[in-house]
C-alpha cells in the first residue's frame, strides 16, 4: 500500500470528522447525544460534550482509567487505544482525528508561518502524565471517582466543541460562567493562534493522544519505509514535512503522522507508507 495522494487523505479526514459528528441537529437546543454509540471511543480527539458527537472522548476514557474503580470500562478504553496505536500509530492523528483536521484548516489562514522549537514537543508527555493520570488519581473522591483534569482545565477541543455551543444554547449555564471558563477560553484562543502560525500546534505540543500514539510509532503496523538503494539524498522529503521530521534519518519519529507528503515529494519513489505485515 502506498500513500501519495493528499486528496485521498483529506477525503478520509473529512469522512472521519463527519462520522465523529453525526448529530448536527443537536446544536439546535444544545442537546448531547447519549445513545449506544457513546460506549465506543473515537480514536482521535473529539469532545464527548459536543452536541454533534457520536462517539466518546478517548482522553476522557483514559482519565476514567486513572480516577475510577469501574475497571470494566477502564480496561476496555485502554485496550481500544492500544489497538489503534499498534495498528496505526500516529497515522490516527494524520488521518482520523477531527481536531487534527480543524488545526490543519486553521493553519491555512494567511499569516507568517513559524517552526516549532524542538523541546516543545515534550510538553505533551508532561500533560499526559500529570493531567490524564496523576491528577485524576490524586483527586479521586470517597466514591472512587476522580476529576477529568485534562478535560476540565486544558482541553481546547472541549471548549470549542462542547463548552461554547452548550453555553450559547442554555441561559442557565451562562449564569454559572466563572474564572475557569475564561482560563479555558484563553487556552483555546492561544491554541488557535498557535495553529495559525505553526502547523498542528496543539497536536505537536499539548495533545496527550499524540503522546500516546507517538510512543507507538516504532511498533505500529502502519510504517514509513525508506528504500536506501533508491534514495538520492535530495532532501525534498525533509523540506516538505510540516511536522519537521527527517523521514530518511528518523522514519519512526514520534512526530510523524504518516500523512504521505514525503512520499508524494520523493522523485525516486524511495518512500513508502502503509501496513507492514510480514
What is each PLM-predicted segment?
Residues 1-248, 254-278:
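Non-ligating segments of multi-cofactor redox enzymes
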